[in-house]
Amino acid sequence: MSRQPVRIEPLEARHARAVLGIYRLGIDGGDATLETEPPTWERFTATRMPGHRFVAVDPGDGGVLGWVACKRVSDRGAYAGVVEHSVYVHPDARGRGVGKALLRALIESTEAAGIWTIQSGIFPENAASLAMHAAAGFRVVGTRERLGRQHDRWRDVVLVERRSPAIV
């Protein structure tokens, strides 16, 4: 992996193996998700919104460094402008601004589409993700205590959201 600035591209089927591999690394790391297995590619693409999913690519070798994608929180019309997102960065690419660049791309695409709120759940132990989200304009809404079990222990999840100042 080079240390050059990353390139952001739309997430496409050709990225499937790398994206699901990074998802797997997040699961194995223990502080990214309550999931125990990555979804199939078919399920991944069926549940994430087209036009609002991106990969960060290393301009040196073309490798995928991370990804971001979102899905609607509800099919009710009142929540049409509210999405939940996930952002994952390969462990070897952390500290390079990959997550920040991915969040910026997601914010730009969702605002252009009239989406007014982006939210996510983050484990309180994931200080780097909480800091990155705060720097991108997300605020902590609250903590959902004992939301789910992981490896025989209850996990809390911090709910963060970003309300777009561009959508009034």
Tell me the role of every PLM-derived stretch:
Residues 13, 21-37:
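Helix-loop element at the rim of GNAT/NAT acetyltransferase active sites that forms part
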Residues 6-19:
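A short beta-loop-alpha structural element at the N-terminal edge
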Residues 32, 36-92, 103-104, 109, ...:
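Acetyl-CoA-dependent GNAT
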Residues 94, 120-130:
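Conserved beta-strand-loop-alpha-helix junction that forms the acyl-donor binding cleft
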Residues 110-122:
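Conserved GNAT acetyl-CoA-binding A-motif
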Residues 95-108, 130-135:
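Conserved acetyl-CoA-binding loop-helix of GNAT-fold acetyltransferases
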Residues 69-72, 77, 121-122, 134, ...:
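Conserved catalytic-core motifs of GNAT/GCN5-like acyltransferases
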